[in-house]
Regions:
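Signature of N-terminal electron-transfer/Fe-S-associated modules in redox systems
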Residues: 1-154
Length: 154
């Protein structure tokens, strides 16, 4: 199936954002992260109008929903690109944007350092010798599942 990928791009946080569209022939079981990698792997990346384009800047670490690096807005919703598959999206036009609550580094990459700085400020961790009840352990386990991707802040 042929998809149109509409990407909100930006050179850096001071630059003005712009939209660029690409086309890709892909199967539904391809993830957004894998699709971006396929676009960037092209010998010569051209947009939908045939104009040569810079590679799309995005972060993809684990590709299996473990690190949160690939968080972005996909069709307006905060999602992980590695676990969002073409077949799960409606339509043949896919809109990709950086998360809106963080400064843009470039294209789909954002600076989430404010999250980590705030966690340091509030000392949100347990000392190694802290006693935990079973209830506390369960809460700690649930919070440890957070990827710190920033999707929940959208």
């Amino acid at each position: 199936m042929r998809y149109t990928i509409r990407i909100k791009r930006q050179e850096n946080k001071e630059a003005k954002p712009f939209w660029q569209e690409f086309e890709i022939e892909a199967e539904g079981e391809l993830s957004i992260a894998a699709m971006l990698n396929e676009l960037n792997a092209r010998q010569k990346l051209t947009d939908k109008s045939g104009k040569e384009a810079e590679p799309i800047s995005c972060e993809c670490g684990c590709m299996v929903k473990k690190c949160g690096a690939c968080a972005m807005r996909i069709n307006g919703l905060p999602e992980l690109a590695c676990s969002t598959f073409l077949q799960s999206l409606k339509g043949k036009v896919i809109v990709l944007e950086p998360l809106s609550k963080f400064p843009v580094v470039k294209d789909l990459i954002v600076d989430r350092s404010v999250v980590f700085e705030n966690l340091k400020k509030i000392n949100l961790w347990l000392e190694s010798d802290a006693y935990m009840t079973e209830y506390t352990h369960e809460i700690r386990y649930q919070s440890a599942r957070c990827l710190m991707c920033g999707c929940c802040l959208e």
